[in-house]
Amino acid sequence: MAREAAEKTATSTSLAALAGLVERYANPDFAIAPGGHVQTISPGHYTVSGLSRHVRLGDFVAHKSTTGTHLGEVVRVEPERVVVCPIEPGDPIGIHDVVIRKGAFRIAPTDNWCGRTINALAEPIDGLGALLQGDIRRSIANTAPPSMTRKRVEQGFRTGVRAIDIFSPLCLGQRLGIFAGSGVGKSTLLSMLARADAFDKVVIALVGERGREVREFIEDTLGDNLSKSVAVVATSDESPMLRKMAPLTAVTIAEHYRDKGDNVLLIVDSVTRFAHAIREVATAAGEPPIARGYPASVFTELPRLLERAGPGAEGAGTITAIISILVDGDNHNDPVADSARGILDGHIVLDRSLAEEGRYPPVNPLASISRLARKAWTPDQEKLVARLKSLIHRFEETRDLRLIGGYRPGGDADLDMAIKQVPVIYDVLKQMPGERPAFDAFTDLANALKAAAMGNQPGAAGLRGRG
């Protein structure tokens, strides 16, 4: 009996030891991985020999130096060497330092990430302690769901911004771009849209933003939505690799919540700085420019990022993406803006001249388009908006004529109506960031037009600030 007990004890001990080994080597931190050595060092990248057969584009590697282990991404693979861009600037790199393959970069989001601010590596930067990790690790370089497995986009929602809810209404699962030059009000409009109450979760990627604005945006703008929001931050002084990764990390977090059935709002400010980061990395890898200094990889990565947003499969939720595009020199046909416009489901154009007049948000209702507007409008609303756009167009095209005194009342009924009603429409569209979101934009507009028709036009100004 004693012998049998000893054999059972030895067997159980061996099994426990074997299980421990399996668990240990299943962990990527302990697994045996191929490695190489640093061969050359240049500003923004370094080359490694001995890894060409073992890595793929986009794989992460760990560079071991005298100060610790630092991450890098493989951006070019050649027969005898690979080119690696370090993730963080200032990493100390020496010739013959050891470099180990890590594979795809993965994160494990959970609901506990809500209310937190993290960097592009999914590390907390808000001083609130460590992040709890989920059960499923997701690659940030994931692909979009197959098109035929996705639900249709059907349900409209209220943003609370009258200029958008009337002229360019949105649907859950839509991807919308906000196009504007610098200093026109993109971030301000995004902050107004972030307060929409139609979403279970909000994920925000702040890419290349000024450091002083990050805390203001998160704490002042989100308000009650802060508890259901995750902010991913890569400021302008961080490396191009981190600025490139931030939107990918954000959309991966949004995918986690969508797959659980949540309706998610994804805000990226801005995709242009994401494109600039890709350009910096591609230039370091030796990729030639093809369009105004942008390499081909920019126009490959943009659709990969944007197509990951949208509706999920049956039973899943949606990702409604609202992204900002900074147009260089107010040129709305620059390569990044033109490429993004062709991918997105609509675009809001912010006009600098409207901002200079003090009309906020400076949304140009004639140039802004929502490709899914018909799913959000009722038939009567669609007819009304078509009529409103006609009046606004008539009002704007005759502005010079009226300035030189060439307008005579009674000669053109449409122009007479435009002159009476368009200023009222413009007044209704004005909203300041601190105002409560509009509950029903069409009702506000109808009330203002009725007041103007009764000769009480000043009362229309009182609409601003009503919820």
Curated annotation (Swiss-Prot):
Reaction equation(s) it catalyzes:
ATP + H2O + 4 H(+)(in) = ADP + phosphate + 5 H(+)(out)
Might you give the EC number(s) for this enzyme? 7.1.2.2
Q: Where in the cell is it found?
A: Cytoplasm
Q: Which GO terms describe its biological process?
A: bacterial-type flagellum organization; protein secretion by the type III secretion system
Q: Name one Pfam family in it.
A: T3SS_ATPase_C
Give the binding site residues for ATP. Answer: A180, G181, S182, G183, V184, G185, K186, S187
Gene Ontology cellular component terms for the protein in this record? bacterial-type flagellum; cytoplasm; type III protein secretion system complex
Q: Which UniProt keywords apply?
A: ATP synthesis, ATP-binding, Bacterial flagellum biogenesis, Bacterial flagellum protein export, Cytoplasm, Hydrogen ion transport, Ion transport, Nucleotide-binding, Protein transport, Translocase, Transport
Family statement: Belongs to the ATPase alpha/beta chains family.
Which PANTHER family does the entry mention? ATP SYNTHASE, SPI-1 TYPE 3 SECRETION SYSTEM ATPASE
Could you tell me what this protein does?
A: Probable catalytic subunit of a protein translocase for flagellum-specific export, or a proton translocase involved in local circuits at the flagellum.
Which protein, by its recorded name, is this?
A: Flagellum-specific ATP synthase
Which organism's genome codes for this protein?
Rhizobium meliloti (strain 1021)
